[in-house]
A protein has these predicted regions:
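Thiol/selenol-based redox catalytic cores and closely related redox-interacting motifs
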Residues: 35-117
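Local sequence-structure signature of Cys/Sec-based thiol-disulfide redox active-site neighborhoods
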Residues: 1-24, 28-33
Length: 117
């Protein structure tokens, strides 16, 4: 397993993801979305997992709603904005190779662990 956890802020779901993999002694890499620039292919993988670009946008909290991307409706505009400002993504985004979850999804993570053993 090659786990990467993409985060833009510490929130309960991020802590759940960290705890899940720590408890199972599964190594993971934290990717800070404020520092890590996403590539277009990487973002497209996340969009496929979320179902739409709009579903990836963080809309929780006052600061998130101040971002222009929180009010965009066109996928192409959202994608361009997310490439420039990946901190606007919901987190955590947990990646295991080409498999991705958005938010805390322990059932899927358990499946990944079962497949790896």
């Amino acid at each position: 397993m090659n786990i990467q956890i993409y985060v833009n802020k510490k929130n309960p779901d991020v802590l759940k993801a960290e705890r899940f993999f720590k408890e199972r002694r599964i190594p993971y890499q934290m990717m800070d979305l404020k520092k890590h620039k996403l590539g277009k292919k990487e973002l497209e993988l996340f969009i496929r997992a979320a179902g739409s670009a709009r579903a990836l946008v963080d809309r929780e909290g006052k600061k998130a709603l101040e971002r222009p991307v929180a009010h965009m409706t066109t996928d192409s505009l959202i994608i361009a904005e997310l490439l420039n400002d990946p901190a606007a993504l919901r987190s955590p985004i947990v990646r295991n190779g080409s498999k991705v979850t958005i938010g805390a999804d322990e059932e899927v993570w358990k499946q990944w662990v079962a497949e790896a053993t």
